[in-house]
Amino acid sequence: MNLTALKNMPVSELITLGEKMGLENLARMRKQDIIFAILKQHAKSGEDIFGDGVLEILQDGFGFLRSADSSYLAGPDDIYVSPSQIRRFNLRTGDTISGKIRPPKEGERYFALLKVNAVNYDKPENARSKILFENLTPLHANSRLRMERGNGSTEDLTARVLDLASPIGRGQRGLIVAPPKAGKTILLQNIAQSIAYNHPDCVLMVLLIDERPEEVTEMQRLVKGEVVASTFDEPASRHVQVAEMVIEKAKRLVEHKKDVIILLDSITRLARAYNTVVPASGKVLTGGVDANALHRPKRFFGAARNVEEGGSLTIIATALVDTGSKMDEVIYEEFKGTGNMELPLSRKIAEKRVFPAIDYNRSGTRKEELLTLPDELQKMWILRKIIHPMSEIDAMEFLLNKLSMTKTNDEFFDMMKRS
């Protein structure tokens, strides 16, 4: 029996399963307590129970396997991992672990891990010899992540504009600069769907910090990947804990030579949360930002890199501007030069209801020649020369009009050549 499978079952099915096992009064219990009772009953019959989760090591040396379903929030169905197991397999916070578990004994509150079967979807022996993330060699992104799906849909137009304006590679550190109501969430959804469709080999994680609950639900339903969220009604310490767990998990997967992509909405809200949580240093910057507050969000954003030894970590984050808050301006200015891809959205274009509201002339990727073929790069530069004299609204309308006549960007360039 698998603990994760039980968590994914609806309560009605769990109650039916429990009643078959001879358990009573389940209808009045919470879901976690029902699972608890079923597993205890199952263990009495001497059968094996399996569980998995992402390890969080606490200050006392022991750890717990947290569940992604509850956005890594501590819960009664977390699995205890002893310090001896952590030392034996050289485990660190963020490791994804699956193995055999046992129910709590008398006086215990949590399930405990008996045997480790896999670490980061790999054999436990392989986990000991991996190179730490900090010791890996960072390089410029040189392997392209294509966004275009080629199905001619209106959603694909966004992906195609993105491919032309600022190509994304594995290991990119991208910043989407967005004023309010410019369509940043929809843009992120489009990017997530394109990645899931074109690059199923990549591990996709969407991290929503300080977002509205209905947007979280929408994202979970639309995106084929892990959606981790901390909504605006949660405390700042919770935002920080969720972000730390996600970045640690991503780093551990990169150590195993996996390509990981994190879409973060938004880095401004994350920096605000760190500003609330960090102990006061006494030095305060403009807008009420503590001098030490931006170190940790910069470490989060700076983790994005293409790795020479294999694997990559791509982070595409949104930064809020024109919100009327001085703090948001300061945070944006601090992050402005750190990315190697920038995609500014325009409020003017969005107000005219032209989407995607991308400011084509100001967007771009550093070292884009490493991501595109020389022939394609030449065509992209010619397109920029044509669009440059136009205003931002005219440029976007012109581009969308021409793109909608064709299914793919290659066809679009051929059409451009003929005309």
From Swiss-Prot:
One of its GO terms (cellular component) is cytosol. Signal peptide: none annotated. One of its GO terms (biological process) is DNA-templated transcription termination. Keywords: ATP-binding, Helicase, Hydrolase, Nucleotide-binding, RNA-binding, Transcription, Transcription regulation, Transcription termination. InterPro entries: AAA+_ATPase, ATPase_F1/V1/A1_a/bsu_nucl-bd, CSD, NA-bd_OB-fold, P-loop_NTPase, Rho-like_N, Rho_factor_ATP-bd, Rho_N_sf. SUPFAM superfamilies: Nucleic acid-binding proteins (SSF50249), P-loop containing nucleoside triphosphate hydrolases (SSF52540), Rho N-terminal domain-like (SSF68912). CDD domains: Rho_CSD, rho_factor_C. Residues 61-66, 78-80, 108-110 are annotated as: RNA-binding 1. Residues 284-288 are annotated as: RNA-binding 2. Pfam families: ATP-synt_ab, Rho_N, Rho_RNA_bind. ATP binds at G169, R170, G171, Q172, R173, G174, K181, A182, G183, K184, T185, I186, R212. Homohexamer. The homohexamer assembles into an open ring structure. Facilitates transcription termination by a mechanism that involves Rho binding to the nascent RNA, activation of Rho's RNA-dependent ATPase activity, and release of the mRNA from the DNA template. Belongs to the Rho family. This is Transcription termination factor Rho. The lineage of its organism: Bacteria, Pseudomonadati, Pseudomonadota, Gammaproteobacteria, Enterobacterales.
